[in-house]
Amino acid sequence: MVHFTTEEKAAVASLWAKVNVEVVGGESLARLLIVYPWTQRFFDSFGNLCSESAIMGNPKVKAHGRKVLNSFGNAIKHMDDLKGTFADLSELHCDKLHVDPPNFRLLGNMILIVLATHFSKEFTPQMQAAWQKLTNAVANALAHKYH
């Protein structure tokens, strides 16, 4: 179990309060699909993913990105029980969707990049460390069913 300090929780919550879930979520998922094109195989039903502009403008990518980032909002509310919080999603991604666990970390890294882009002044090394810890912990929680 990952332990978050009071300072880390406060840092994550303070930035989260400013996040536009639709924008950051959509950009994060789009970056994942562009930078790591093999991840597109998990999104066959999303239609046209043949180019960067098609991915960035795809409404299904944006909608699913928002959904993914909303789950991070849930994680922030339950930072002391991420495995429990993500148990159902872990089962879904393992048993039905067959998503390879390393992809969770890749998406977490995309979220960090987009947050740094949108909040450059506030995304200090300390803020990055807190968010990196959270994205890694969420990735581990999502991969829990695989073990």
Swiss-Prot record:
Any Pfam family: Globin
Domain Globin: from-to ranges: 3-147
TM regions (residue ranges): none
One example GO MF annotation: peroxidase activity
GO process annotations (BP): hydrogen peroxide catabolic process
Top-rank taxon, per record: Eukaryota
CC terms in the record's Gene Ontology section: blood microparticle; haptoglobin-hemoglobin complex; hemoglobin complex
Gene3D superfamilies: Globins
Tissue: Red blood cells.
Binding annotation for heme b: H64, H93
UniProt keyword terms in alphabetical order: Heme, Iron, Metal-binding, Oxygen transport, Transport
Oligomer and partners: Heterotetramer of two epsilon chains and two alpha chains.
Family: Belongs to the globin family.
Entry function: Beta-type chain found in early embryos.
Protein name (database record): Hemoglobin subunit epsilon-2
Natural source organism: Capra hircus (Goat)
Lineage, highest ranks first: Eukaryota, Metazoa, Chordata, Craniata, Vertebrata
